[in-house]
Amino acid sequence: MKVLMVASEVAPFARTGGLAEVTAALPAALRRMGHDVRVIMPFYRCAAQTELGVRKARKSAEVSLNGETHKGFLRQAALGDVPVYLVENREFFSRDYLYGTPEGDYPDNPRRFAFFCRSVLQFLKRMDFRPDVIHCHDWQTALIPIILRLEAADDPFFARTATVFTIHNLAYQGLFPAPAIAETGLPSALFTTEWLEYYGQLNLMKGAILTADLITTVSETYRREIMTPTQGCGLEGVLARRGDDLFGIVNGIDTDEWNPAADKRIFRNYSARALAGKAADKLELQRELGMPAAPSVPLIGMVSRLAEQKGIDLVLELLPRLAESELQFVLLGTGNACYLERLNSFRSKGAANISINLGFNDPLAPKIYAGSDLFLMPSRFEPCGLSQLIAMRYGTVPVVRHTGGLRDTVVDVTRHPREGTGFTFEDFTADACWEAIERALAGYRDRESWRRIMRRGMHRDVSWHNAAGRYETLYRMAADTRRG
């Protein structure tokens, strides 16, 4: 099949979170299955600064939005044997950040990503690439299924092209003031409750949910959750209406990149059969971060965006307990300014057993996955989560809240001693999280039992193979609906 993957970020060209990892690894997995998969994204300043062989493709597009014409140019690179196209427009994409500064989103985001989506459709024609499926990711690409269903339904070029729209996080819907519809190039007649209007605002994700041939999200539990008032973020009714066309597929990870037996970014390699190297990784991590080098002290790691969704409020509440405990805790993260300020304030107190690392530090993340004994994910909600999959791959036992993709991927040791791969808690409270940590510590003291838990996690298939197979099935379903 011919598949175009459209995303606002793709690793390693640009990334702010797990979306970029998915849109890099899934195309590669599908390519290995024999499909002609290509990827397209904006050409951000950070992509221009990479040494990934981005070159000009000598194709251009012109997009008119609200009376102004914007020109785009196509660039091309590759991830392995997957072609990657990048849409260039310096006004829109040559900026320090992808979506906004720490103070807030860029006010012209509707126009920026409308330009991107409309350019994508033009460039397909310039390249004469007619995909069977266009797979769109999150609100930044939502305009593509909307255009193909409501504006270009009679365009013969796309007559046999189906759309699949993936919701990676329903909390980010592409909500804008009503006048922003003019910035997208869509007719104002679509600003109705039937299509794009949402409590007086423009909602791009709502439009994509209503117009895509099929919709996916990134775990089966999250699929069920988002059709309820608790987790539906106001779109539960729209999602329930499309419930038969909504599928949950758990993400995988790139098991070549995330492989403790071969990872050159960590201090010492190891495997499920030969775990000795992990102890060396722990000691080196402790030394690098200026913590006491203590092999027997349990070390909890956390690599996270600093956002309300990720349970950072619970972490802040737990920090005094952690500081007074016999544990060590390492946090790496960047994000919300108020969390940065509060974590900086705690860091200034100088607790010897706590290392708080704020800002983007790519080299440190794999060292934390490898050197930690436990990995904390106290998420308020979690559509899928990749960190728990990476942690298990590295023999680091996850302690997670029992929600979304965490529920689908981490088996609680307390409930299932012979199958368990981690420790879970239900209530979103610091006490519930601490109780799960204490259960994990009790397990940690039984070294032989702990090694069995580690190995179960390391043996779990967290690759993209199964997920890619499910996407392949959905692509065929979507394409069949277009062929009638």
Swiss-Prot record:
Q: In which pathway does it act?
A: Glycan biosynthesis; glycogen biosynthesis
Q: Which SUPFAM superfamilies would you find in this protein's record?
A: UDP-Glycosyltransferase/glycogen phosphorylase
A Pfam family this protein belongs to?
Glycos_transf_1
Keyword Glycosyltransferase set for record = yes
A Gene Ontology biological process term: glycogen biosynthetic process
Determine if Nucleotide-binding is one of this entry's keywords.
no
Q: Which residues bind ADP-alpha-D-glucose?
A: 15
The enzyme class is transferase
- Enzyme Commission code(s) on record: 2.4.1.21
The family this protein is said to belong to: Belongs to the glycosyltransferase 1 family. Bacterial/plant glycogen synthase subfamily.
* Annotated protein name in UniProt: Glycogen synthase 2
